[in-house]
Amino acid sequence: MSTSAKTQSAPDQFFSASLAEADPEIAAAIAGELGRQRHEIELIASENIVSRAVLEAQGSVMTNKYAEGYPGHRYYGGCEFVDVAENLAIDRAKKLFGAGFANVQPNSGSQMNQAVFLALLQPGDTFMGLDLAAGGHLTHGATVNMSGKWFKPVHYTVRREDGIIDMDEVAKIAEANKPKLIIAGGSAYSRAWDFKRFREIADSVGAYFMVDMAHFAGLVAGGVHASPVPHAHVCTTTTHKSLRGPRGGLILCNDEALAKKFNSAIFPGLQGGPLMHVIAAKAVAFKEALQPDFKVYAKNVVENAKALAETLRGHGFDIVSGGTDNHLMLVDLRPKALKGNVSEKALVRAGITCNKNGIPFDPEKPFVTSGIRLGTPAATTRGFGVAEFQQVGGMIAEVLNAIAQSSDGQAPLVEAAIRQRVKELTDRFPIYS
């Protein structure tokens, strides 16, 4: 072979070799993950299943492009096509949520929330959020998080008797601490939020009002959850979870001056070049969420969550707050003398994926917990309805009741039988076939 032919073969192979040819180890891991998603029931509330179109956009050549700045104002040339993608994402996000301004560049939920803090707070400023132990989020002032280290968080919580936020108590805490920012939203709160009352409380103490709707944004987009956009100074959301897009963040507001602050906080404040392949995928997901069938999906997510919660209650399980108004629920396992970590592992062995989760006023450590969190978006996306979620609730009850009677937190025969039933159920609702 000539020297010329040899020098040409390397780039030819670089551009033509499949993943399986170039890196069989990673290809095998991806194939394994696809198999897991196909044959397990996904009940982690923060997870979903994206469309093939979203996957295609995220795996596109836009991953090659650097585009520091914003559309029309980049620090690099050659941005005409990524500008098209970002402008489409911005316009679709604004239309989807009825907002005047949108920043689609945050790489994650944590970074979108950090950007709001950077724009509105100074180090040491006081802000309020829902306590992590009551269903809040790390970025809302947990001591281990930047938000809890750089700022002064004060937290509201839920009532012991019913697991619901006491708005009168929120008002008292705000009046006593005069926070500069009040946050509504969390990662494990299953009830509706009173955005109007939160804004009134924020106004009464001169605070900004922020809603982190990362978990329920898809329900807002689908019209089955009240929108915080008319009430909040700023709304943040991840673009995955119930919104069913790629992993990333989004900032929404209706005030141009604030929008400029948030833009500056993202770039150059926190990030450099945005992930243009992810922004393209966000645009695709927002277009999907603007279609009529997304409203059907959102309605089904809530109906399925209520069905799952009621089924578990019927099997003697305690649901924190007594039920759910959205896509998720917390199961209090203490009446069954079970721990969250043991229950999570048993359900995974049975083909049902969920996560251990602290419950309000949980006496257990975070890696043990007294509860599990369940959510319905992913299984709803693959086609499960109320009947299927009633079956799933029964399967969960069988596994948990079996391990409650065992000495080592395992019930191999029951787990194996349920795993076979899970496979039969998931085979009826294939993904990426």
Swiss-Prot record:
Subunit structure: Homodimer.
Signal peptide per UniProt: none
Entry's EC annotation: 2.1.2.1
This protein's UniProt keywords: Amino-acid biosynthesis, Cytoplasm, One-carbon metabolism, Pyridoxal phosphate, Transferase
Transmembrane regions listed in the UniProt entry: none
BP GO annotations: glycine biosynthetic process from serine; tetrahydrofolate interconversion
Pathway this chain belongs to: One-carbon metabolism; tetrahydrofolate interconversion; Amino-acid biosynthesis; glycine biosynthesis; glycine from L-serine: step 1/1
Taxonomy of the source species: Bacteria, Pseudomonadati, Pseudomonadota, Alphaproteobacteria, Hyphomicrobiales
Protein name: Serine hydroxymethyltransferase
Cofactor(s) annotated in UniProt: pyridoxal 5'-phosphate
Broad enzyme group: transferase
Modified residues annotated as N6-(pyridoxal phosphate)lysine in this record: K241
Family to which the UniProt record says this protein belongs: Belongs to the SHMT family.
Matching Pfam families: SHMT
Domain of life: Bacteria
Record's keyword annotation contains Amino-acid biosynthesis: yes
